[in-house]
Amino acid sequence: WKDKFKNVEDFRRNNVNTVVRNIQKTIIETRPEVIFSISPAADMERNYNTLFADVNTWAKEGWVDVVIPQLYFATGNDATSFNLRLDLWSQYTYENHLLIGYGIYKFGDSQYGSKFQSSDDLMKQFELASAKPKVKGSVLYSAKNLVENKVGIADAVKAIYGKKVLPPYLGRTAAVLPPTPDNIRLNGADLSWGAVSNVAYYAIYKDNGKERKADLVGITQGTSFKLSEKGVYFVTSLFKNNAESEISETVSY
């Protein structure tokens, strides 16, 4: 390694970089629709100097599609706190998408301190992350702990994610949008539209009239949907990778 690198640490980082780059290359060549994600430790310095994982380079070069830092810490003012590390990871998001990893396994376990003895801090963590425009979603570790619902963490998650939403587009390039559904029509409570070629499914929304927001009512692979309550509705089409079209014309039921 001495012929090509200044030190053994750079040599090791290059080896890891090569593995990451080759994994992505293989995915693109064989299954380009597959999303390549990596979940690094929360401590960037430890990643770089101890694990030889140069996550910042992976993100800048676009070698990984999704980064999910393991922010398994309580909120606070010290360097290891959830909020300070959230700020740091949000600053170092480039070609990749950013999802946040939550350590829900710590909640209800006395060895992890007072903030993990109720769901209040988990709610606060969600609120902090939702205020970051670059954060695309959440990953909870682990499913087992969510089912156990210690200190009400499952109830907290239900409260945060009380409304239906679609999975985000996490592709490695700018999304190519499908055509917008047209010929939107109503026959009683039956909403229907013209078929769009090569899409995976359609999403039906109800306009709530507030700040240009709408609520997801349901999804279907067909071209019709039965409405259950009065309101203003529109439809979108989605590819398999969750790239979503512009909204259709609205209809009132």
Regions found by a protein language model. Give the residues of each.
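Proline-enriched interdomain boundary motifs that mark the N-terminal boundary
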Residues: A175-I184
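Conserved aromatic anchor
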Residues: G188-N198
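Beta-strand-rich modules
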Residues: F225-E244
